[in-house]
């Protein structure tokens, strides 16, 4: 009698501990002995209904975590109950061997249930739960038969859907991916529920009313079967839709690839055409630029050539004018030394003295009468040359030059400015050349026995000429300087030609040329 009372107290305490754990912990094996198999059925059906309700809101991660937590809680609760039972047995100290054996068996059962495998107890428990096991087996057989029927129907529906695949429109890849994810999530949830149902079924508290439990079990079975059928239909539809979408996507991708390839070819052609156009445009621009540059160069060459021609014309005009200036004094300078030389060779000193006197008179006066007098003198010279045919052969080219000089002077009788320049150049050349054609004794200031007074007369007009020449040089411009330089050069050439005729006086003439060059340089420095 004591053992029965103690056992009842332990059962009450264990029920209180199960209530505190919010119904998530597993009951002890003793409670299973007390209650009927109908209570177990009710608890299983309630667990299934609650699990189906909360199915849609759960996720994979939450399910996994909940399972681990529940297993840990169940293991902890079982260990706590074991400890409490051991303490109570230790305090009371009076228990029968039968109770000890039952405790050992029940501990083994708890361990097997924590691992997810349910094992029926031996002895009396087998007789108590045999009826519930048979009923569970019958329920499972009925559900299996219904599942087979639904499978046959689903196969027929799949065939019909495969026929209607071609008619349906194309769905995007995004829809396919979303549907595939949903189907996978649902399949995983179902599998997890199937594993979790047997573990949770044992953790619920039993209810006393047997009639209510039977009704709820029947309604839940019907609901579960209907839901299963709907789920199977949804799976088949989604799988068929995914197959269609994949086929259509492949066909669409092939068509889009063909279109894309055609578009790419068109784009490449356009790019090539544009590149060709650009190249042609650049070539045309280069050609135009080359043409423009060539035309500009030609124009520049033409302008430069025209300017060069103008400069050449100006230079040629200036050279012609300078040539004219050169020619006139040269020819006139050649005349006077030839007269003097011829007069000295013939021995007519009076005629040689009269020629420079007339030239000085011409320098003083610029009237046409002086010009006429010059012409008369030239004619007289020609007559003297024709009369004196016994002269040396060296004098013959000089006579031709004299004729040319006479013609030029007759052709240009009215040029006043040229006569002025000629008169200046004549005076300069006379200064440089008269001492050359003196007698040797006169250069050394030695006079002839008959003509000392004549030498004095010559020196006076020479001094008078030098003063006049200096005054004219101060007034004259740079052009006269050039003419003086040219005249000095001409006089040097004439002196060289005369040196060939007169080898006796070469040393004296060289000394005079050096003196003349020195005097010319000094004059330039003064200016």
Swiss-Prot record:
PTM info: Citrullinated by PADI4.
Glycyl lysine isopeptide (Lys-Gly) (interchain with G-Cter in SUMO2) cross-link site: 105
Residue ranges of the region described as Interaction with DAXX: 290-427
Regions of compositional bias (Basic residues) in chain numbering: 47-59, 85-94, 267-297, 435-446
Entry's Gene Ontology cellular component terms: chromosome, subtelomeric region; chromosome, telomeric region; condensed chromosome, centromeric region; heterochromatin; nuclear chromosome; nucleus; pericentric heterochromatin; PML body
In-chain residues carrying the UniProt-annotated modification Phosphoserine: 62, 74, 112-114, 162, 345-346, 354, 423, 425, 427, 449, 453
Domain of life: Eukaryota
GO BP of this protein: cellular response to hydroxyurea; chromatin organization; chromatin remodeling; chromosome organization involved in meiotic cell cycle; DNA damage response, signal transduction by p53 class mediator; DNA repair; forebrain development; meiotic spindle organization
Localisation: Nucleus; Chromosome, Telomere; Nucleus, PML body
Region annotation (Disordered) ranges: 1-527
Compositional bias (Polar residues): 14-23
Listed GO MF terms: ATP binding; ATP hydrolysis activity; chromatin binding; chromo shadow domain binding; DNA binding; DNA translocase activity; helicase activity; histone binding
Keywords recorded for this protein, A-Z: ATP-binding, Chromatin regulator, Chromosome, Citrullination, DNA damage, DNA repair, DNA-binding, Helicase, Hydrolase, Isopeptide bond, Nucleotide-binding, Nucleus, Phosphoprotein, Telomere, Transcription, Transcription regulation, Ubl conjugation
InterPro entries: ATRX_domain-containing
Modified residues (Citrulline): 184
Ranges of biased composition (kind: Acidic residues): 387-398
Enzyme Commission number(s) of this protein: 3.6.4.12
Recorded family membership: Belongs to the SNF2/RAD54 helicase family.
Quaternary structure (record): Interacts with DAXX to form the chromatin remodeling complex ATRX:DAXX. Probably binds EZH2. Binds annexin V in a calcium and phosphatidylcholine/phosphatidylserine-dependent manner. Interacts directly with CBX5 via the PxVxL motif. Interacts with RAD50, MRE11 and NBN; indicative for an association with the MRN complex. Interacts with histone MACROH2A1. Interacts with histone H3 peptides methylated at 'Lys-10' with preferences H3K9me3 > H3K9me2 > H3K9me1. Interacts with histone H3 peptides unmethylated at 'Lys-5' (H3K4me0). Interacts with MECP2, SMC1 and SMC3.
Function: Involved in transcriptional regulation and chromatin remodeling. Facilitates DNA replication in multiple cellular environments and is required for efficient replication of a subset of genomic loci. Binds to DNA tandem repeat sequences in both telomeres and euchromatin and in vitro binds DNA quadruplex structures. May help stabilizing G-rich regions into regular chromatin structures by remodeling G4 DNA and incorporating H3.3-containing nucleosomes.
Domain commentary: The ADD domain predominantly interacts with histone H3 trimethylated at 'Lys-10'(H3K9me3) (and to a lesser extent H3 mono- or dimethylated at 'Lys-10') and simultaneously to histone H3 unmethylated at 'Lys-5' (H3K4me0). The interaction with H3K9me3 is disrupted by the presence of H3K4me3 suggesting a readout of the combined histone H3 methylation state.
Protein name: Transcriptional regulator ATRX
Organism in which the protein naturally occurs: Rattus norvegicus
């Amino acid at each position: 009698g004591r053992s029965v009372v103690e056992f009842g107290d332990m059962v009450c305490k264990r029920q209180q501990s199960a209530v505190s754990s919010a119904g998530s912990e597993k009951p002890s094996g003793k409670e299973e002995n007390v209650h009927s198999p109908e209570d177990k059925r009710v608890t299983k059906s309630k667990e299934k209904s609650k699990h189906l309700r909360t199915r849609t809101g759960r996720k994979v991660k939450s399910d996994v975590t909940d399972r681990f937590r529940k297993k840990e809680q169940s293991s902890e609760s079982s260990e706590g109950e074991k400890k409490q039972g051991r303490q109570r047995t230790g305090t009371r100290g009076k228990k029968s061997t039968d109770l000890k054996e039952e405790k050992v068996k029940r501990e083994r059962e708890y361990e097997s249930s924590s691992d997810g495998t349910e094992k029926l107890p031996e002895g009396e428990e087998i007789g108590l739960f045999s009826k519930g096991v048979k009923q569970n087996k019958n329920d499972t057989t009925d559900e299996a038969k219904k599942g087979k029927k639904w499978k046959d129907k689903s196969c027929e529906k799949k065939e019909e859907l495969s026929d209607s695949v071609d008619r349906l429109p194309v769905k995007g890849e995004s829809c396919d991916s979303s549907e595939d994810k949903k189907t996978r999530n649902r399949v995983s949830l179902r599998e997890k529920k199937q594993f979790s149902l047997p573990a949770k079924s044992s953790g619920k508290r039993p209810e006393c009313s047997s009639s209510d439990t039977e009704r709820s079990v029947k309604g839940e079975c019907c609901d579960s079967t209907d839901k299963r059928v709907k789920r199977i239909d949804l799976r088949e539809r989604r799988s068929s839709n995914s197959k269609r979408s994949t086929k259509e996507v492949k066909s669409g991708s092939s068509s889009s690839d063909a279109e894309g390839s055609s578009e790419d070819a068109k784009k490449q052609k356009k790019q090539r055409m544009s590149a060709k156009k650009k190249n042609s445009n650049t070539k045309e621009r280069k050609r135009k630029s080359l043409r423009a540059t060539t035309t500009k160069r030609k124009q520049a060459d033409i302008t430069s050539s025209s300017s060069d021609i103008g400069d050449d014309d100006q230079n040629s005009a200036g050279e012609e004018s300078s040539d004219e200036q050169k020619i006139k004094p040269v020819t006139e300078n050649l005349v006077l030394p030839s007269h003097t030389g011829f007069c000295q060779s013939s021995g007519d000193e009076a005629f040689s003295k009269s020629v420079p006197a007339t030239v000085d008179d011409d320098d003083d006066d610029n009237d046409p009468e002086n010009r006429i007098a010059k012409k008369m003198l030239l004619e007289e010279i020609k007559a003297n040359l024709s009369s004196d045919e016994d002269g040396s052969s060296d004098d013959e080219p000089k006579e031709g030059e004299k004729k040319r000089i006479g013609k030029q002077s007759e052709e240009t009788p009215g040029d006043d400015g040229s006569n002025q320049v000629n008169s200046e150049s004549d005076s300069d050349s006379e200064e440089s050349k008269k001492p050359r054609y003196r007698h040797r004794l006169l250069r050394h200031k030695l006079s002839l026995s008959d003509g000392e007074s004549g030498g004095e007369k010559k020196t006076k007009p020479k001094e008078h000429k030098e003063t006049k020449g200096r005054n004219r040089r101060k007034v004259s411009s740079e052009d006269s300087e050039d003419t003086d330089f040219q005249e000095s050069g001409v006089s040097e050439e004439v002196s060289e030609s005369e040196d060939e005729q007169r080898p006796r006086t070469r040393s004296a003439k060289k000394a005079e040329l050096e003196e003349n060059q020195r005097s010319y340089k000094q004059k330039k420095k003064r200016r």
